[in-house]
Regions:
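Solvent-exposed soluble domains appended to multi-pass membrane proteins
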Residues: 1-175
Length: 175
């Protein structure tokens, strides 16, 4: 997205929230605002991490104290986090986790139409068709915060975690 696109989105969102704030239902409303990966990453076979770094915002002035979180997470973590912010006690069927919990493990799930990626810490595993797997180390630079370096050896613990997370989510979805 261009700078102009970001500025317009910011303007439009601000106008929407300003108009909503004058409505009688505003104090009883939670706004969850997020994005999807950018259009230029759709259909690609490689997984460009920088195109999957997206914003998310939970806005509910009557319920949620303003703050900022700089953790690596995924969209699946939004609802568990929201329920936690609202103080809701519930039995979780969510695959995501509350990103504000002390035991939250920072990780991200990213995918293209063929490849599945799993980022945890500085290790990025890419699962591809026909039992192919690659691993990379995240090596940020001043010019590229998402620079990846292919590893020679596969970390089997990280590989097995990536496989098990995607397999269990697939099986769970078939129930």
């Amino acid at each position: 997205m261009t700078a102009g696109g970001v500025m317009y989105s910011d303007y439009a969102l601000g106008g929407f929230l300003d108009a909503a704030s004058r409505e009688p239902w505003f104090d009883n409303t939670v706004f969850v605002i997020t994005a999807d990966h950018c259009a230029s990453s759709a259909g690609k076979t490689e997984i460009p991490l920088e195109k999957y770094h997206i914003p998310a915002m939970i806005y509910a002035p009557a319920f949620v104290t303003p703050g900022s979180v700089g953790k690596t997470a995924s969209q699946i973590d939004l609802m568990p986090t929201l329920f936690s912010l609202l103080g809701m006690d519930y039995d979780s069927w969510f695959y995501g986790r509350d990103i504000l919990a002390d035991d939250f493990r920072e990780r991200a799930f990213v995918a293209t139409y063929q490849d599945l990626g799993y980022l945890e810490g500085d290790r990025f595993t890419v699962l591809s068709p026909v039992d192919r797997a690659e691993q990379f180390l995240l090596r940020p630079t001043d010019d590229d915060p998402y620079a990846l370096e292919r590893t020679e050896a596969i970390d089997s613990t990280h590989l097995n975690r990536a496989i098990s997370l995607y397999q269990t989510s697939s099986q769970w979805n078939k129930r």
